[in-house]
A protein has these predicted regions:
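Conserved N-terminal segment of class I S-adenosyl-L-methionine
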Residues: 1-158, 170-173, 277-281
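A C-terminal cap/extension of S-adenosyl-L-methionine-dependent methyltransferases
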Residues: 201, 233-287
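Short, glycine-/aromatic-enriched active-site segment of Class I SAM-dependent methyltransferases
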Residues: 188-212
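A short glycine-rich, Lys/Arg-flanked "PGG" loop and its adjoining helix->strand segment in the class I
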Residues: 170-182
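Short catalytic micro-motifs in class I SAM-dependent methyltransferases
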Residues: 159-163
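Short glycine-centered segments of the SAM/dcSAM-binding site in methyltransferase folds
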Residues: 95, 183-185
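Short N-terminal helix/helix-N-cap motif within the alpha/beta-hydrolase-1
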Residues: 165-169, 198
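Short alpha-helix
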Residues: 213-228
């Protein structure tokens, strides 16, 4: 592995309470494990997703996901924000599927308004606490979507796509398309590679090299959606606390212009709230 220096990290240290040594250790371990995923044959890779995350948390015990304390109020605010995007697509007959449901906080909230919900994740343990009469938990290998075909009217994922190997992402999208009902839709939220990277490699590298196996632009994700068969793709950027529908062409034009800027400028301005809101990939694809 190439040498890691401390110079690239300086500009980011103000955004974290972690030491340079802790971040460097995390970086080295995550890159090692991510490379294991990237280089594994497909039949081995599907079984590796859970394994490498378990190993990361074991070898990096001060990982932010293990040490960050999130209050109930903060967790609730995050759920409310995500529901504010989804609520316009939900009615009493909605069949909802969340990919990467985690502890199920969002799915349980949607279950108050929908007919049926599926909470899908790769971890049986993390799904064990998800209990509701209208919620069914579903275990996936990272690609499979084992729910009835043509049954889901609204699917959703939040910051999941970037963690999936590009080959697996396309297969998962095909599997997802198969379970979505005619005229049903998939809402996908993922960070934009143009103001990334957004994983631990942000401290050192111009592109994601850690567990964000591939970060996307809205244009790139639209191409994937259309490749698997979705007929319509819309953008829903967030402004002043609200998600607004916007022609995808506007977002793609902004991405094109932003992408013309030198990396150093994109790095400097890409974290400004107005730029973040415009660039966050928040798309609705309709079957």
């Amino acid at each position: 592995m190439e040498a890691v220096g401390t110079a690239p990290i300086a500009a980011r240290l103000a955004q974290t309470t972690r030491s340079v040594e802790d971040i460097e250790h995390h970086y080295r371990i995550e890159l090692e494990l991510a490379e294991r995923l990237r280089s594994a044959p497909r039949d081995e890779r599907l079984g590796l997703y859970g394994e490498v995350y378990d190993e990361l948390f074991r070898r990096v015990p001060n990982h932010p996901q293990l040490t960050r304390k999130v209050s109930d109020a903060e967790r609730r605010a995050a759920v409310i924000d995500r529901v504010s995007l989804l609520r316009r697509f939900i009615d009493p007959e909605t069949v909802f599927l969340e990919i990467g449901a985690g502890d199920g906080s969002l799915t349980l909230e949607v279950a108050r308004h929908a007919r049926k919900c599926y909470a899908l994740d790769v971890s049986r343990e993390i799904l064990s606490g998800v209990q509701h009469p209208r919620v069914e938990t579903v275990l996936s290998d990272g690609c499979s979507v084992p729910v009835p075909a043509n049954s889901v009217t609204l699917a959703y994922s939040f910051q999941v796509m970037e963690h999936i190997h590009p080959e697996d992402a396309l297969e998962q999208l095909r599997n997802l398309f198969a379970v979505i009902a005619p005229e049903g839709s998939y809402v996908c939220v993922t960070p934009n590679r143009l103001n990334g990277p957004h994983d631990v490699s942000k401290f050192y590298d111009p592109v994601a090299r850690g567990f964000h196996l591939k970060e996307y632009t809205a244009a790139e994700l639209e191409a994937l959606f259309r490749r698997v068969g979705f007929s319509k793709v819309e953008a829903y950027p967030r402004f002043r606390g609200r998600y607004i529908r916007m022609p995808l062409g506007v977002i793609k034009s902004f991405e094109w212009l932003f992408g013309l800027l030198p990396y150093s400028i994109r790095k400097r301005i890409g974290r400004k709230p107005i730029i973040q809101n415009m660039l966050q990939v928040s798309l609705r694809a309709t079957k």
